[in-house]
Regions:
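Beta-lactam-recognizing serine transpeptidase/beta-lactamase-like catalytic domain environment
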Residues: 1-49, 54-182
Length: 182
């Protein structure tokens, strides 16, 4: 990396010899974009279990769960005819309290928690946490999270969202939302 020429490609070995000028220019553009891409703001991903802290925060705030609540995990649940597995498939985690369900990252427990919240409340929290748009960070190229409209009415969508699947967020938006929980 040359501080005086930040747009220069630092890994010239990746540029193959024998290319036409057009091919070389295209390859250089691709390498430059890869070199400067900020994945924390430019890319989105499904947060998976890293989202469970937000589901738990929503449920605690709304008094939908108590620390004394218990959950049974047989290794899967069926929602609207779709079988959703836990990370620990049958026989599952079995009987567990809230803290253990969180520690086990138990999908059926978090589906149960999400269903207690309901679609409208869950979606409103996603908006409040800033997960349906851009964070507004002062830089270019920030991507927006992607939340399907089906979260507003589909029990299956809610079940999947509760453990961080079927929607996309940027890493910076997820971190900002998680920081709001602390």
């Amino acid at each position: 990396y040359d501080l005086n020429a930040p747009a220069s490609i630092y890994n010239k070995e990746m540029l193959a010899a024998g290319m036409t000028d057009e091919e070389l220019a295209a390859a250089a553009d691709t390498l430059q974009n890869m070199q400067w891409r900020n994945k924390a703001i430019n890319d989105t991903f499904q947060p998976g279990s890293t989202f469970k802290i937000l589901t738990l925060a929503m449920a605690l705030e709304e008094n939908k769960v108590k620390m004394s609540d218990t959950f049974n995990c047989p290794g899967y649940v069926v929602i609207e005819g779709a079988k959703i597995n836990c990370s620990k498939r049958a026989p599952g985690h079995g009987h567990q309290d809230l803290i253990t369900a969180f520690a086990n990252s138990c999908n059926p427990a978090f589906i149960n928690i999400g269903l207690r919240l309901g679609n409208t409340t869950f979606y409103n929290y996603m908006k409040a946490f800033g997960l349906t748009g851009k964070t507004g960070v002062d830089t270019t190229g920030e991507a927006s999270g992607f939340v399907n409209k089906e979260i507003e009415y589909s029990t299956l969508a809610l079940a999947c969202y509760a453990f961080g699947q079927n929607f996309n967020v940027t890493p910076i938006a997820l971190l900002a939302a998680q920081c709001a929980c602390v």
